[in-house]
Amino acid sequence: MAKVAMIGAGSWATALAQVLAQNNNSVLLWARRPELAQLINEGENKRYLPGVQLHPSLSADTDLEKVLHQAEAVVFGVPSHGFRELLQKSRPYIKSDAFIINVAKGLEESTLLRLSEVCASEFGEAVLSRYAVLSGPSHAEEVGLNIPTAVVAAAQEIRMAEYVQDLFMSQDFRVYTNPDLVGVELGGALKNIIALGTGIADGLGFGDNTKAAMMTRGLAEITRLGYSMGANLLTFAGLAGVGDLIVTCTSMHSRNRRCGIAIGQGKTIQEAVESVNMVVEGIRTTHVAWELAKNQGVEMPITEQTYQVLFHGLSPRDAVLNLMGRGKKNEVEELSLATYNIIQ
């Protein structure tokens, strides 16, 4: 049994805390707001994960020092834009040998850094030997109800990925390992952009053909950027790549898809975000990915058009027309290049 601190009290943090508690770990969850901690201590996070009766051993507190005291593992389940701040606040209370696990799917907007890089910038590069990320197709609403789910734990050190695998894995929550930290982080973050775009197509009333094209070509541009940043191309064919992309682009639970639908139906960006009533990571990630693509010299047409809709007022319908009106391409040449790069 491990003593685990869960930093965050949203739907995903609560669902994963439930998994950990059901695995007989001692889990204390940190909530920023007292009323949220009270809901969790009463047995149900009615604000973010309604309908899920929490494990009796799971409890929450607003005292960060108390939550982190002597924790063997610290799981950060907060949105990417709050990650650095909570690292800074937590650092004085985290044991020097504690394992750090991040479960957020995003990139830091102000620096364009992956979240493992953010952690290394605050704790030093040595922290990466005990750092891992958990990602994959996994909506909190289903995980909380013990619906069978498969995810991937990635870390630079395979023993760290295996530690996370042992910590979380259960009959209903299957965990694979992957040494490609870069690819798993990017897959989890970038699929939110494609989900926004697919949602916009939904909102415009386009059909399954359009959505299939968006998802397939979206995966191609995610893979191009990932490869340029040092990721293993095969990662994007796995749970953190195509797996997460499918569920985020198609599920009624997907915040990014729902936000995109609202935009496609004519709502302003602010109105669309407010209609979701939760953090929509894909909006910030679109800005970061647009900058990264420019810096890396990588073509990302869906990201480009989504960026123009979100930040420069391009109409969603014109964005789709721009994508359909691009110059001729040869798909086989792209696939051949990817295969060649894997072999090399």
Curated annotation (Swiss-Prot):
Q: What is its EC number?
A: 1.1.1.94
Q: Which residues bind NADPH?
A: 11-12, 32-33, 105, 140, 255, 279, 281
| Superkingdom to which the source organism belongs | Bacteria
Signal peptide limits? none
Keyword list, A-Z: Cytoplasm, Lipid biosynthesis, Lipid metabolism, NAD, NADP, Nucleotide-binding, Oxidoreductase, Phospholipid biosynthesis, Phospholipid metabolism
- Can you say where in the cell this protein is located? Cytoplasm
- Show the catalytic activity: sn-glycerol 3-phosphate + NAD(+) = dihydroxyacetone phosphate + NADH + H(+); sn-glycerol 3-phosphate + NADP(+) = dihydroxyacetone phosphate + NADPH + H(+)
Q: Name one GO cellular component term.
A: cytosol
Q: Name one GO molecular function term.
A: glycerol-3-phosphate dehydrogenase [NAD(P)+] activity
UniProt record, GO biological process:
carbohydrate metabolic process; glycerol-3-phosphate biosynthetic process; glycerol-3-phosphate catabolic process; glycerophospholipid metabolic process; phospholipid biosynthetic process
Q: In which pathway does it act?
A: Membrane lipid metabolism; glycerophospholipid metabolism
Tell me the active site.
191
Q: Which residues bind sn-glycerol 3-phosphate?
A: 105, 136, 138, 191, 244, 254-256
Indicate yes or no for the key word Nucleotide-binding.
yes
Family, per entry: Belongs to the NAD-dependent glycerol-3-phosphate dehydrogenase family.
What does the protein in this record do?
Catalyzes the reduction of the glycolytic intermediate dihydroxyacetone phosphate (DHAP) to sn-glycerol 3-phosphate (G3P), the key precursor for phospholipid synthesis.
The name on file for this protein is Glycerol-3-phosphate dehydrogenase [NAD(P)+]
Q: Which organism is it from?
A: Desulforamulus reducens (strain ATCC BAA-1160 / DSM 100696 / MI-1)
Where is the organism placed in the taxonomic lineage, from the top?
Answer: Bacteria, Bacillati, Bacillota, Clostridia, Eubacteriales
